[in-house]
Amino acid sequence: MQHPILAKVLSDIELRNHGGATKDVYLRTCARYLDFLGDKPLEAADESDVRAFSRHLRCDCCLAPKTVNTYLAAVLFMYEVGLDRPMNRRQIPFMRKPKAMPKVFSREEMAAVLAAAENVKHRVQISLGYGSGLRISEVCRLRVRDVDSEAMRLLVEDGKGAKDRYTLLPATTLALLREYWEVYRPNHAEGWLFLGPYGYTHVTDSAVRYGLSEAMRKAGVEPAGRSFHTLRASFATHLLEDGTDLMTIKSLMGHSSLSSTAVYLHVADMARGVASPVDSVMAPSWL
């Protein structure tokens, strides 16, 4: 039987008009926390239980700091909004996130991965990540009506932060979409472009990830540190390398802050092989 607090959390999320992805993550996390408590009533749990849950996520489940922090935010929302019970946040620290540079595919690797994706559905999903800069959740939730072949653009509805935006629809991706349509012709009341295995709802994140991982394996591309988000990072980095201005990329990516986009400047500079100024003032004698 579902705990009544989950219905309250759902209502509170919908009143705040949070995006669908936030709703799904918060509800799954709250249910997971209730399972973690076991027989202990939610009302009897306190900060020590939330701390134990945080350690469990990091140490036992080996989740990344960013994921742990998202889960903690969901649990705190359940307590502070759902139960109207303030928590001592000093006792529930969020994890520091390492500032790692985003990994990107080289253009040669991207060509190999796309060529290795034998299923047209997987190929077009990979193309949407790399060619249009879509997040994996945005690929899953893409609707047929979002594809504007006349203006050559995609409408991303209810993206991260519950924001809508337009992004590029490359000619090669449109050709793949048409090929995909000829094979699958998805028909769903909600208009999802990519359906799940039983046709009830849209495709899952895990199915899209599988398509990319299989294509990388067949292409012989190193998978370590690479995910579907790497396609999006490669989209931004390669646009910068080609001279696209930062504000345009920010808009295409759906970033709320320019600093989020500026991270890719450093990656693009490294990829360009930026020369050190010392090379212009002194030449090594061994050259």
PLM regions: where:
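Conserved catalytic core of the tyrosine transesterase superfamily
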Residues: 1-287
